[in-house]
Amino acid sequence: MDKEFRKQGRALREISYIDRLRYVGNNAMGSLSFSPQESEEFIGKSLEIIGIEKLNQNALAIFEEDSHDVLETLNRIASSGGSRPKGNLYFSKDLRLCNESWQPSFDGWIVKFKTHSTVLASEEGVCEYIYAKLAKQAGITLPDTHLFELSDSRLFAIQRFDREDQRRIFVDVL
């Protein structure tokens, strides 16, 4: 977010909490959003509908080379915390196409991209997928999960439980 503000020529010391909330707008995790949202020109245009393979290549470019060309896009989809790069994406029912914005018949998913900076490297996704399957076998209720098998990596994805079409669902997790 700070990089986007700098790119717009705004000094960070002058950015208010309201400016930051307007930037997040309707793209926040969970059930809360903020209105009015920043203009489309400021926050960027919607991703073209692309395949997960291309998105994964872009994520690797960001986290290994800090490529500015794709940083802006991935910054908008990666609003969740944690040590691994993630994307909050919407996928077609067959999971072949994705977009950062809701589309009719697309569902919300969180995808965890691979990194080379951890012990497991490209096997992180496989491990998390196995953990999810074990949790389901143990009777723990989880949203749908998927393992994307790409040419050079396997990515874990979990369907969002706080979205239904364009509706946000409030969930209190203890």
Question: What residues fall within each predicted segment?
Answer:
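Phosphate/dinucleotide-binding and metal-coordinating scaffold of catalytic cores
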Residues: 1-174
